[in-house]
Amino acid sequence: MPFIYCITNGNKKIHPSNQLILAALKEQFRDEFQIYNSPDTSAAIQRIHSLQQTCTHLIGVGGDGTFNVLVNGVCSHPNPAFRPILGVLPNGTGNDFYRSAGFQSTHDFFEKIQSGTFDLFDVGKVQTEVETRYFANITDIGFGGAVVLELPSAWTTSKDAHELVE
């Protein structure tokens, strides 16, 4: 039986369609499903580092930044054998990784978890003298975040923007 651990951005409201998916996962997997509302990136990575081999699936509810936190938490995990199946429910601004993974709807995501199927993806590594970071679909040096900050909030929170990934 899989053990599914879900990390959400505790500072962001979860879209209603994702709330339904989380409720369905909780109902199906019961004690094998837990949700952690992370207050920030470092808390999320610390929580991922505390997970053990019993965690078979790690799901983020967010966008590319949330998925990046999952990738960095798993790749920097103290136990290099810790490699749960990663997933993301789109609750971000761009949701590029979710779209590039070929999901047409959050229902597709739910069915993939139920069926136990998954796809492999490449992870890149950037190592400096100060730190090591990992990335799955894109890396930048801060410009991407600046663009998101400049977007009108109506565009990033509108129903139409979320339906782009549903």
Predicted regions and their residues:
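Gly/Ser-rich catalytic serine loop of serine hydrolases
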Residues: G63-D64, G92
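ATP/NTP phosphate-donor binding region
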Residues: M1-V61, N68, N72-C75, F103, ...
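Helix N-cap/beta->alpha junction signal
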Residues: G62-G63, D140
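Catalytic core of DAGKc-family lipid kinases
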Residues: Y5-I7, K13, Y36-S38, P80-E166
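Short, active-site-adjacent cap segments at secondary-structure transitions
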Residues: T66-F67, D96
